[in-house]
Amino acid sequence: MSFQVRVKQNMQDLDNRLAAFPQLNSLEKNFGVSKLYVFLTAAGIYALFLFLNWGGFLLTNLLAFAMPAFFSINAIETTNKADDTQWLTYYLVTSFLNVIEYWSQLILYYVPVYWLLKAIFLIWLALPKFNGATIIYRHLIRPYITPHVIRICKSVSRQNAAPAPTASSFAHTTATDIPPSI
């Protein structure tokens, strides 16, 4: 299948998916502009703003919240565990990105289109078609973090299994641990 045919097929598929939004259908009916063109224009303006870094931080955080919030609410309402795992993993990865963004000024110095790249990455993470969050979890987070989580959980369970010290035993051990004055 040629590239041109695939693009037309994907655009038709997107147009069919956009038909589920009554606001876009109403806009198309009232103004005679295809909902697909309205969507693509809005996406293009959004990408331009990110490329020029006009409100990049806010725009990517809105993207990181809005679409996943919708899918997360749907996941909460279903009994399917797979979609819950997808969104928990997504939030784990985006939280890690937020930690990295502490150094955002330094990142923007070396990667001026960081916000645009982050938006593309967030879309890849969030869309079930790509399953990006699960890929990141399986290949980056799980192999390096899970052994530490298991060790921490064992330590916490040992602490919870041990009897809690009373105030008098704490005072006694503290008093005996104090070295004599010189």
UniProtKB/Swiss-Prot annotation:
Residues 55-56, 103-105 are lumenal. Residues 1-34, 76-85, 125-182 are cytoplasmic. The keyword Endoplasmic reticulum applies. Keywords: Cell cycle, Cell division, Endoplasmic reticulum, Membrane, Nucleus, Transmembrane, Transmembrane helix. GO terms for molecular function: membrane bending activity. One of its GO terms (biological process) is endoplasmic reticulum organization. InterPro entries: TB2_DP1_HVA22 (IPR004345). It is a multi-pass membrane protein. It is found in: Endoplasmic reticulum membrane; Nucleus membrane. The short lumenal loops between transmembrane domains 1 and 2 and between transmembrane domains 3 and 4 may impart a wedge-like configuration, thus deforming membranes. Required to generate and maintain the structure of the tubular endoplasmic reticulum network and the vacuole. Induces high curvature in membranes and causes membrane tubule formation. Involved in membrane/vesicle trafficking. Required for the correct positioning of the cellular division plane by delimiting the actomyosin ring assembly at the cell equator. Oligomer. Interacts with RTN1 and TTS1. This is Protein yop1. It comes from Schizosaccharomyces pombe (strain 972 / ATCC 24843). The lineage of its organism: Eukaryota, Fungi, Dikarya, Ascomycota, Taphrinomycotina.
